[in-house]
UniProtKB/Swiss-Prot annotation:
Keywords: Cytoplasm, Endonuclease, Hydrolase, Metal-binding, Nuclease, Ribosome biogenesis, rRNA processing, Zinc. Binds 1 zinc ion. This is Endoribonuclease YbeY. It is found in: Cytoplasm. GO terms for biological process: rRNA processing. Zn(2+) binds at H111, H115, H121. Belongs to the endoribonuclease YbeY family. Signal peptide: none annotated. The lineage of its organism: Bacteria, Pseudomonadati, Pseudomonadota, Gammaproteobacteria, Pseudomonadales.
Length: 160
């Protein structure tokens, strides 16, 4: 079971907690046992500040992942880490890319959760593995391939 701590520090419209929970559970189902993670929904000001502080990028990005660095033996439930999602950026990207908000939110939550599990996309082989898993999980939800050649740019971690 995933214990989700949802923090809403945004005035924008966000998905229902049940949807966020469902997307996290889907992305994290390969992990056995209970886990805890936090999703913090922010506006552009906080998103920009966090991106500047942690990545030295002076703009708000869609999702930031902060894997926990606490040994499991010190916790009642293993802590996976935190996701920070900038609500206005998600809304803007979905509109610019011609995606439904639901599909884009699902993609970003899954993408962030996979980062918490250690997946990355710095090297081409790692990117292919991570994107293939994202495609599979999104297809299970009935969402289209966000990386399809005929779809608009995804905007996912375009600056990494």
């Amino acid at each position: 079971m995933i214990e989700l701590d949802l923090q809403c520090a945004s005035t924008g419209a966000a998905p229902a907690a049940a949807d966020l929970q469902r997307w996290c559970e889907l992305a994290l189902r390969q992990r056995s046992g209970d886990s805890e993670l936090t999703i913090r929904l922010v506006d552009e000001e906080e998103g920009r500040e966090l991106n500047r502080t942690w990545r030295q990028k002076d703009y708000a990005t869609n999702v930031l992942s902060f894997p926990a660095d606490v040994p499991d033996e010190f916790l009642d439930i293993p802590l996976l880490g935190d996701l920070v999602i900038c609500v206005p950026v998600v809304e803007r990207e979905a509109a610019e890319q011609g995606k439904t908000l639901d599909a884009h939110w699902a993609h970003l939550v899954i993408h962030g959760c996979l980062h918490l599990l250690g997946y990355d996309h710095i090297e081409d082989a790692e990117a292919e593995e991570m994107e293939a898993l994202e495609r599979q999980l999104l297809a299970e939800l009935g969402h289209p391939d966000p990386y399809a050649e005929d779809s608009p740019e995804t905007g996912i971690c375009k600056d990494s």
